[in-house]
Amino acid sequence: EAAIIAMRKLPNVIMPFPGGVVRSGSKVGSKYPALFASSNDAYCPTIRGITKTELLPDTSSVLEIVIDGLTEADIRLAMRVGMQAVCKLGAKRGVQKITAGNYGGKLGQFHFKLREIMK
C-alpha cells in the first residue's frame, strides 16, 4: 500500500488492479488453455507444502503490483518510487524481499532490472 500511495502521485502511470495490489504472484500461462495467466505456485504461500517454493520459511504473504505506463521511463520511475516507499517500511514492518518477474519475454519486449532502476 505504501508503494501504491507513492506511485499514484506520479503522472502517466496506473496500477490497474483494484487497490493497486494483487495477492500472490502471477505467471504467464496456465494448465487451462483459456486462461492467459495463473498464480505463480513458487510464490504462493498457501500451497508451499505441495510445490517447489521460492519463499523464505516465514513468508506468509506475497503481493504483486502491476504498473502500466505511457513510456518505459514512466514505469522505471514508478518502480523506483514504489520500491523506495516499501524499503522505508523495512523488515520490522514485514518486508522481506522485492523481486520482479520477466516472464521469459512473453509479456513484451521490456525488461526492468531492479538493481539498475535503484541506482
Model-derived features with residue positions:
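Conserved mixed alpha/beta catalytic, RNA-binding, or beta-rich assembly cores of soluble enzyme
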Residues: 1-64, 68-112, 116-119
